[in-house]
Amino acid sequence: MTADRETGKDTNEFFRNMMISNLYGSYNRLWVAPDSLKRNIIDAIDSEIEKVKSGSSGYIIMKANSLTERSIIDKLSEASCAGVEINLIIRGICCILPGIEGYTENIRVFSLVGRFLEHHRVYMFGQKDERKIYIS
């Protein structure tokens, strides 16, 4: 829930598009699969890499049912090599091997398996006042 008007406009447009089976709408605030979700995640990871390169710290938390998308796995590995601290909370299949020196040493993976399947995802990039959180 939000009172943000831009998010409300995007949400309204999203549901309009769903009614006409348009999967490729243009949104300012929403990250929608299949069109913009992957691209926006990769851009956000790149932003954390740039923070580390400029002397700040980079931080990523991702919570999802699975992590199998090769381009995102490669980008997370690149971020780890750059020094970004990454915590992944993955319920099911996770195709990244954490803790490999020089490759995924800054990645930790937690697996939460319970009786009930959860469908929400949470992506957090950055820390403190600069963090951005995306929830679905």
PLM features: residue spans?
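PLD/PLD-like phosphodiesterase catalytic module centered on the HKD motif
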Residues: 2-8, 21-26, 34-136
